[in-house]
Amino acid sequence: MSLRPISLMLALLLTSAPALAQSAPTPPATVQTEPRETIEGTLSQERTVIGIPSFATASVQTVAGLRTDALGRQLADVIAADLERSGLFEPIGPNGVRAIGRAEVQAPRFGEWQARGAENVVHGFVDAGSNGSLIVGCYLYDTALGSELVRKGFEIQPADWRRAAHKCADAIYSRLSGEAPFFDSRVAYIAESGPKGNRIKRLAIMDSDGGNHRFITNGQALALSPRFSPDYKKIVYVSYLNDRVRVFIYDVASGTQRLVTESRNPTFAPRWSPDGTQILYSMAVGGNTDIYRISANGGTPVRLTTAPGIDVGGSFSPDGRKIVFESDRSGSQQLYVMNIDGSNQQRISFGGGRYATPEWSPRGDLIAFTRMGGGEFRIGVMTPSGGGVRMLTNGWQDEAPTWSPNGRVIQFFRTTPGREGRSSLWQVDLTGVNLRRLPTPQDGSDPSWGPVLP
């Protein structure tokens, strides 16, 4: 995969576009029944109107079967979809919007966009580069001030055009929201097919919006509980085959995998440490289920919990000093926090119902969880001390939250009622209002949202 950021001045030289050779301005530095705390930051139900016409091209060329004019429309489509999906923006275009010429990329008609109610406008271009590459440039403007806010340029291989669109959307989102980016990231999950009693479960990977989908495993073994490594390069997951339980690490670049540990005892829920050197997992031995820590290179595991009962679902804090997990030692599933050596185990959930599948936010400020009660499973968040509980979803069975790289959006899977209940992937932001379903070719469960790609 190749996506090389370049300056737009270099992009202009590479594409030899005299219309853009002029100097550019320098960019300036579901209804809930429970009360919610105020969320600090930019999350809001008010959306910024933003114009996004198709990207221009100096001359129509075909690169690796892609016409640059058609690709200009596709780039704008992906950027518009990304921004709209964030819940913060209301895109105008590219459908129903006049196509711009190359000379207009750096000379927007601000009055035209203001008349349509757009506070900002995105312009861009795509051209054939050297040696079969593509050059993509994108700009963000403030229509009221008539000023440039963002400029980005990339030299890419044609297969990576969607990544260029996500990178542009990330730059726009970050500039206007003040939040860290999250669009140019990937999701690993379990693709499910077949009857409920004999499900085929395969490890799969896709872009954060469902694009570029591919299956990793063939379905001969049951795949469960995938999790991206902090550097995105690997995925740890559990494989069940012939009464053997194995924890594998899959290398995303090479497509190879290696064994971390195996057992005939039920083993599940592997999780990476923030530095990528350690893995947590849960294993049932002699009627007791406990949390273990093992080197990512394998070796002898260290048992962290010893209380009678079931202790599962460990997740590291971003600083690597704490672990949140679930335990039924009190008589029902509740959340606990402990030090990484297993000491100082403290219960943090005290609301009604049972709590499970905790996941620490990459920002460190919240823990996402599944709460079970009244015949329903719902996704919520709380502070690491157990305060500020907010429920974000109202589905019949929503579970297994995973955080976006910037800690502002949560993905999970939802199962429909009935004997043949179908599972699908969803996401919701911290307002609990912006609920979306992710497209997948099959049923999906147990998502893992990876970090932003370099």
Swiss-Prot record:
Keyword Ligase: no
Localization annotation: Periplasm
Quaternary state and interactors: The Tol-Pal system is composed of five core proteins: the inner membrane proteins TolA, TolQ and TolR, the periplasmic protein TolB and the outer membrane protein Pal. They form a network linking the inner and outer membranes and the peptidoglycan layer.
Family matches, as InterPro entries: 6-blade_b-propeller_TolB-like (IPR011042), PD40 (IPR011659), Tol-Pal_TolB (IPR014167), TolB_N (IPR007195)
Record family assignment: Belongs to the TolB family.
Gene that this polypeptide is encoded by: tolB
Signal sequence extent: 1-21
Pfam families, per the entry: PD40, TolB_N
Organism: Sphingopyxis alaskensis (strain DSM 13593 / LMG 18877 / RB2256)
Role played: Part of the Tol-Pal system, which plays a role in outer membrane invagination during cell division and is important for maintaining outer membrane integrity.
This protein's name: Tol-Pal system protein TolB
GO CC annotation: periplasmic space
An example Gene Ontology biological process: cell division
Keyword entries, A-Z: Cell cycle, Cell division, Periplasm, Signal
Domain of life: Bacteria
